Amino acid sequence: MFSNTFRKALLIAATVAMPSLASAGQPFDAKAFQVSQAAGKSILVDVTAPWCPTCKQQRPIVEEIEKEHPDLVVYDVDFDTAKDALRQFRVQHKSTLIVFKGAKEVARSTGETDPAPLRSLVAKAF
């Protein structure tokens, strides 16, 4: 049996560690994506893989952009497991970012790690 003090300490430690485990956006869900499109939202689809060095470079930039644009909906597509989504978006490479304004794709980039072009890419949805 764990004491309440130990449980509280464990909870605090887990909470402190969470930001390092957090990722931008939310896992891709086709239905939620369609709802966002129908609502005319600005959307960023981030095709990523946990082992991808370019994706790791993009991650903090995407997180910053997400903070700068609170109305931006970000969906993470796992390159290794989300094969249906990869076909849907015609994606062949990880580290691909796709920007939508509602149902219309307005921009796409693969492998870009410079913050300025990525910000310009997302700005096309606003």
Where are these regions (language model features)?
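Typically the conserved alpha-helix immediately C-terminal to a functionally engaged Cys/Sec
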Residues: 54-68
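Non-catalytic, surface beta->alpha helical segment in thiol-disulfide oxidoreductase systems
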Residues: 99-126
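Structural micro-motif
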Residues: 89-98
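A short beta-strand-turn-helix
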Residues: 25-42, 83
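Short pre-active-site segment immediately N-terminal to redox-active cysteine/selenocysteine motifs
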Residues: 40-43, 47-51, 93
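Thiol-based oxidoreductase modules, predominantly thioredoxin-like and allied folds used
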Residues: 47, 66, 70-84
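N-terminal targeting signals for export/organelle localization
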Residues: 1-25
